[in-house]
Amino acid sequence: MSVESMRLAEGPLAGPVVAGAVILPKDSQILYLNDSKQLSAKRREELYDIIMEQAVSVGIGYSSPARIDEINILQATYEAMREAIGKLNPRPQILLNDAVTIPEVVIPQVPIIKGDARSVSIAAASIVAKVTRDRLMVEYDKIMPEYRFASNKGYGSAEHIRALKKYGPSPIHRASFITHFV
C-alpha cells in the first residue's frame, strides 16, 4: 500500500495552504487522473467525488495564513503535509511525494519530479487538495465578496489586487505575501 502526499497552494495571496494524502486501492481504475492544474474545475470536482468514494483513505491538512506568516510557506506546507499523512488509516508503508521529502516523517518517502503528472495517486492527492481549497475559498467569498475569492481563489489576479488596495487585507490574507500590494 502506498500513499501520495501533495502540496498545494503555495502562491496565493490569501487562504491556507492545503495538502492532500490519498491511499488508492492497488487495482484502482479511476480514469483521467492527472495534474490538477491541467484539469478543468468541472473535471476536478467529478474526480474528487470518485476519489473520495474509491480511496482506501484520504487525509487533508491545513496551515493557516497566520501560520504561514509565522514560520514561512515551506515549513507551513510541511506541517500541512504531516497533518494530512497523520489522518490516514491505515498507515501507509511508503509515501510517493510530488518532488519533496517531508521532514520529520518516519515513513519511507520517494520524491517524484512532476509526480502529479506521473503517478495517479499523487494526482489524486493533488485533486483532493485543490478542490478542498477551492471550495473553502468559495465559502470565504460569501463572507468577503469584495475580494472575489470565488473567482480568483486567493491568487493575485488584477481584480484581487485592486480590491486589496481598496479595502486592505482581510483576516485570511497572507501578510508576508502582500507587502508590496498594500
Regions found by a protein language model. Name each.
Residues M1-V182:
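RNase H-like, Mg2+-dependent phosphodiesterase core
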